[in-house]
Amino acid sequence: MENPPIDFETAEFALRRSWEIHRQAFGPILEPAFEENQQVRILLINALNHISNRDVKRGMKLLKEIHPHCIYDEDKAAWTFFVGLCFEMGGAREQMLQWYENAAKFGHRFYLPFMKLAKAAHTQAQFQKGADYYKTAIDCLLEMSENDRDEVILGSAYTNLTSCLTMLHQYTDAEKAWMEAQKYPLQPGADATAAILYAAMQNAEKTAVHIQQLKEKFPGWVAQTVEMTRQILDGTHPAFPVEK
């Protein structure tokens, strides 16, 4: 029995489509990787397809095959980052942090490792570390040309920096970060961050403005934000004690 003919055109289209999907997700850290070795790029696309489908074991196996071909810093940055992504998806936090930290060493312009590290620190209430990583990610993004820059990520980074600085009681810097955030597209829940900031600054009027905007844009967050800002304004929230 003869094998069916290979439709190379369809196969090439599938590869290009997969590459574009991953490029949109991972941007600058992916685009320059293995630029001179298309066979390795095909392996990388295959690895990312498996990782995105949560087949982390197969994805990691393919990454191991790719490792000997890491020649340039761009290759090493991408490879190291995606190993970190495997550990993240596998729930191995310590290994994830180690690999993302290693990826961050291969070029300041790659913002993704810093965003991953920032969010990890932020969710663990390590606000100073989170703020520092967000600042570095912002620097990376601002170094890019306006055409290449992801303004949604930039708006998110500034908003999360605002949150970290608010929790550190660095209100002047937090408000500056919020002013910068508003220059870019913001997530629907961003007004919750602003409401908490202004409550911490004891500005009830601005707090109310952002809660109203939250009601219009992201009503699912209204109740918890109203309660938190009420406690902050009343001086009963443990993270924002009233100075006597």
Labelled PLM ranges:
Residues 26-36, 67-76, 139-151:
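Flexible helix-coil transition and linker loops at the boundaries of alpha-helical arrays
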Residues 38-41, 45, 82, 116, ...:
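"A position-specific structural signal for the A-helix of alpha-solenoid helical repeats
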Residues 41, 75-78, 112, 149-152, ...:
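Start-of-helix register in tetratricopeptide repeats
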Residues 71-74, 108, 142, 185-186, ...:
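Short coil turns that delineate tetratricopeptide repeat
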